[in-house]
Amino acid sequence: MTIRALGDIRVVELTTELWSAFGAALLGDFGADVIRVEDLSRPARDPDRDGTRPPGGFDADSELVQRNKRSIGLDLRDPAARQVLADLLATADVFLTDLPFAEIEAQGWSYDDLAAANPGIVYVRGSGFGPRGPDRDLPALDELAAARTGVMPTLPQPGEPPVYAGAGQMYTAVMLAFGTLVALHERAESGEGQVVDASLFAGNMYGSSLMLDAYMAMRDDRLSVPVSRLDAGNPMSGAGLAYPTSDGRWVTLTMPDTDRWWPSFSEMMGLDVDDPRWDTHDKRCGEGRREMMAILEERFSQQSGAYWRERFSEARLSADIMERYEYAADYTQAAVNRYILELEHPSYGRYQSLGFPVHMGDTPARLRRMAPGVGQHGAEVLQEVLGRSDAEIAELESAGVLGTVRAEDASRPSTQSGESREPERAVSTGAGPLAGVRVLDLTVWFQGPVCGQLLADFGADVIHIERPEFGDPARGVRSINAIPVAEWNQYFLVVNRNKRSMAIDLKSDAGRELLHRMVEQADVFLWNQSMDNLATLGLDYETLSAINPKLVFATNSGYGHRGSNRPAFDMTVQALTGIMTRLGEPGQPPIYLGLGGGDAFGGLMSALGIMVALHHRRETGRGQYVDASLLGSQLYLAVPSLQRFLASHNPYYADQHSRHAARNPLWNRYRAEDGWMFICMEDTEESFASFCAATGAAVLCDDPRFSSHQARRIEHESLVKELDSVMAERTTGEWMQRFAEHGVVAAPILDFRDMAVDEQAWANDYLLRAPCGEAGGDVEFRGLPVTLSRTPGRVEQLGLELGQDTELALFDTFGVSWDEIAELKVKGAIP
């Protein structure tokens, strides 16, 4: 019998969007009993509302985000149905919803309402823009949130339209699951529930983490504009860096300019390592970088992509070829690590699907049931959970309260634009919901440190263990996109906040023995360096779990716990997923999702896996091995298009698509007089009439080419062209005023300068201030992406000096005497 890590948890889910449903599915994958409530009075969500899913195939999105759930269909207009929902919620550990705040309050489904009957309920809410602030009631659409974060204008080549990648919503989905488990962990101690909020706004901010961190520190507007692919700050790495090969493919390089990479790379490319044009870091990443990139451009163009991939592999370089989705679908690493599955659907036959991004050694995620039909388990749920009799169930069915068919048209008034009561800001006064969890964080650069940061933000005692003398290589970051870092190194300090710092030489016998002693008193061991080094250093899972069977042993590998262990950085791995080659206008170079975007998502996935393992340990007393890889995580960043490709193998989902050819012109990006805007409207007769009224372009409504939904689909390119002309006539501010008057959903596409002063971001602690010793005062930085109402996270300090806490931590936390500490110094174990 398979052990289910979350088998003791019941989740009642009432959602309308795919990203929030996916948050619940992640809990179901690890064994939670997820009961999806389908409101029969609402029509089904149109999977092609944005025009990105052409006719044909089946609803692959739903097969992914609704798996491992049971479904009950209730007509929630009926008081009897609402009573059934109330009864279900009284038995639930978690209620997960994405309904608008105003509707939640109007229906009597607020946290206060539910907690009166079930004080321990964890109330999880997926919102658009957070629980507080002036814009908390804006529609929860990922495009609107992405437009506001500042990242969209930075992604393409100069002169190209802002790029919407669709990845922010995947951050939010995982944040919902992570926040749920943090609150459940705290509930196990206090017995009390609370509200968890994860918003699309916060998800998209974390998707642009490194660039946003850099802008908040440097306030340099050059970070808000696109960078040409041959103007990268490092010829061996850069957000837009791409070199074409002889067969029309693209090379990506992701190697910091250090002694670890430069000699090997220069030798492979036939560059003289001692050439005075680039014999120092400052020359290679400064005055000599453009000349070197021109030489590399010419040399890469002489050979095929396959040739270069083989050379990179031989030299063990973090470099590869940017692939399409076809590669990901057949990639052995994705299959052997269960990131992509081969499934058999009872109606559609054989197909591929995304699998499970986090590996758990003892309690792996499983596909226990396919996505259910609407209301498929209604009778089962009522009997098993509520003890209803057959006669009672039959009565509900005959009254239309319980069923399996959704309404075809909306029959309830929309509350999406209504206003709701803003909750008071929670103030953290205790030790945090993860107090008592001790993490030994032996990670470097970004992915692993992000994981440790998320745990530390919520109160875990995270001890960052670095090598003496130099420490984490991220301490040496000098520039972002060829722009010198500010007076403080935000790259390192932000993701290592709230941690203690220790310096231990793990190459010495005494250092390894010391770490083994610390493992005895640790809950989590976290590692993202070379997997080969674990056994060499005596830090492998078998060794450490023998020392402490309760230890959660967490790694952040590059390509998974099985198969390849070659060097991996964010962009190199992202290149293999296919997401980069489908973004942007046709013919443009592949587009990287943004500095650190994949790393940060991998760190979030790792934190989720650790929380699952800690929950299971509470029940069993045993830890286990957890791995969250860059490959597994980044495949999930591509869910909105990759899942559809895997199910259909339709190249449409792997191709670049021009905004000029948007299949729904009302869900598209347009340039206004002073900047770009994102309009997000389903193409219905009502919405088209509202849009025409807002723009004053009534002539469009009378144009026979656009007289119906079907006609507009046929003439979609002509309509985009007309709207381009119309939108250019006014400023974004003028358009937003007119759109608000006519109910048109839209947002200006902003830059990082706007993001830095965004009132909504500050109101929800998505941006924070804290003292920074390196800067000599307070600094502003990316804050807390998940809000807990009763035990919120907090930031007390940014990253510390190397080894600052070594001696005190050994004495106070691990019980090492001062005499022993002196001896460790003599042996070179600590500085």
Where are these regions (language model features)?
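A short glycine-threonine-serine/GTX helix/turn-capping micro-motif
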Residues: 161-171, 193-195, 230-238, 251-252, ...
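N-terminal helix-loop segment corresponding to the beta1-alpha1 unit
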Residues: 1-192, 373, 379-625, 653, ...
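Short, well-structured beta-strand/strand-turn elements
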Residues: 34, 313-327, 388-393, 462-465, ...
